[in-house]
Amino acid sequence: MITTKNSIRTLALAGLISIVSSCNLTELDINTDPNRPASGSLGLLLPLAENAARNAFTAINSDAMGFAGLWTSSDSYNLSNTSYQGTWNGAYQNLQNMEEMLKATEDGKNPRYRGIAMVLKAYSMGNYVDMFGDMPYTEAWKGNAATPNTSPKFDKDSDIYEALIKLCDQAIVELAKAQPIAVINDYMGAGNATTWTRIARTVKLRLLLNSRKGRATGNAELKAAFDAGGFITTPAQNWTYLYSTQISPERNTHPWFITYTGTSDPNYISHQLMGEMILNKDPRLPFYFYRQTTRILDQNNPTDRGSTPFGGSYLPLRDSFLDEYKKAFGITGAIPAADLGYIAGFFGRDRADVSGVAADGPLRATPGTYPAGGVFSDRSVAAASLTGQAALNFGGDGQWPLIHSWNTKYYQIEAILDGTGVTGDPKALFIAAMREQIAVVVAQGLKSDPSRAKTPVAAEIDAYVKAWTDLYDAAATNQAKLNVVAKQIWFCSWGQGMDIWNLQRRTGYPIQSQFKQFSVGIQAPISKPPRQYALRLPYPQSEGALNPNASKFITDVIFDRDPIFWDKVKTKWEF
């Protein structure tokens, strides 16, 4: 597995880099021996650049999950020109690390560092273009140049994509060259050229998949990339960012683990996500979510009634869900009290519930072992509020799945079913993708909470996979099959917001549908959102005061009307 750890060494380097960066870091002509180039400064920059790529993954991970209906972060689409000022500024601050590496390797003496920086830049900038569209690129990062440019032009999103695709190819060329001195402080690829070449090919594949409908040669180039191979295909090759249980001198636990410290309440998780995983007997359920309560809120108690989720959506009292539950588990008559208490632990909200926030933090379901490194929570584990539970604040060694083997299998399935010319057996790929993602989830749980977590019985996984392949087989057309696959990707996307948001914008799938067992769609918002589905992020108002070239983008581009160049679907929800 390709992993990266934000270790103590990386954190300690941050202050040093801020000092070194103020010097003329790129002047490597101080070397007197051309056969022994000075790579120390590059070794300091590399972990920062890798963390910057992590930041490109997490920048709007939560909101993208909300756009997709996985939890409540920005799921009402009430966005404005002040919503993402920090995201915009962070993009250019993070990418500066990669720019410094590229400047420092222009002399050709450190090709592997250069290739790595190119890969990280292509991945990161690709994510930001998927968020905002047109952005400063060719004239960016020149504020401190000999001839400063503090008002860079905005490049077209399609032009940036072309440059990033070429950047991946250039990275592969650089990585094939001999590196005189070993690469140091590489927490993602251990300085291995083969590993980084594989990541470069995978990033290129992702860029080609996203942009295929917006480029004249999109399908042909995507097919060529799949035919060429060399991208991530096995779990051992997964590109993953790992956290640890370290809390001193700097906390290095997974960001979602903050709930376990008792200092922050979790987002409301989608009732549909949790409820359908219950009904579908999804083996990932106890790894995804931790239950804090078994108490069913008393509707005769004003306080409990005020904490009850809006509009009859509360699962233990939701008749439509309980009817589905009885069918799924073969229950005749009343549902046992123990079952209702178990269901009560999956306390969240329906999509686009904009009602006020109650004092319900100790009731909310919270992220479990995957990806947060939290606590496993099956029926045998007693639910307990995290407030004041120091005994549960022991983990946090979670992960972010940057790009995994199951992602690339889903990429291939989409390409096959959507008629791009890419070949393969989509059903076999679907089965493999499900099994590989489940295995990652289980492994994380066994690592983070070994005393509680249990490996699912093989027959349970087999039954689950068969149920979804049966849905796939029953779908009459390739587009219907792609929708089934997209709904499974939705379940897989717990912790991976950008990929599911991109999928919805590329394909329009999963479709809008009801909340029930083995539904192949996403439920409609429970209340009408103030805006439509987010096709992109709004440009930050603050940028207009800094760069006059931004003004027209701030005023003329509407986030729920104007798509990214590759989005030909323009997803809209029926309210």
Labelled PLM ranges:
Residues 21-28, 66-74, 133-141, 448-461:
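Short, compositionally biased low-complexity segments
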Residues 23-75, 82, 87-92, 100, ...:
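Membrane-proximal, proline-rich intrinsically disordered regions
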Residues 1-21:
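Sec-dependent bacterial lipoprotein signal peptides
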Residues 61-65, 290-291, 497-506:
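Short coil/turn segments at secondary-structure boundaries
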Residues 409, 416-420, 435-575:
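C-terminal functional modules
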Residues 40, 69-120, 124-440, 478-480:
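Structured, solvent-exposed acidic/aromatic patches
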